[in-house]
Amino acid sequence: MDDIILIAVPEEAPAIMLWDNVFFTGIGKINATYTATHLLHHYKPKRVWNFGTAGGVTLSPGFYEVGSVVQTDMWLPALGLTRGKTPQDLCPEIISLDSNGVICGTADEFVEDPENLAEYCDIVDME
């Protein structure tokens, strides 16, 4: 299988949910990571597509290609760390992909005040 498509829940893409290369991860970063890791080892795809619903922070509704991701629920200012930086983590605060697309903030929580995230990301998701 050259391509796999990851979607959190069937309601996000009912038109393609029966394709044989579509897999549902469940909601949240841990569920998405676990499912993606399993599928990568099993199918060894050339490309992985993450498709789903995201909330707008600085952008209006539409279709966007993600160019970078940041963990918006990781924020420890008391330790002098910027949003997205995990202590002793080797990953950068912002992980850049092979695209010039928008910045997606990901978290395992719903966003109550998008204005607090406007300097960090354009859209938000939970996977």
Task: Place the predicted regions along the sequence by residue.
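Internal glycine-rich, Lys/Arg-flanked active-site/core loops of soluble domains
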Residues: 8
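Glycine-rich phosphate- or other oxyanion-binding loops that anchor nucleotides, phosphorylated ligands
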Residues: 11-126
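Extreme N-terminal starter segment of soluble prokaryotic enzymes
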Residues: 1-5
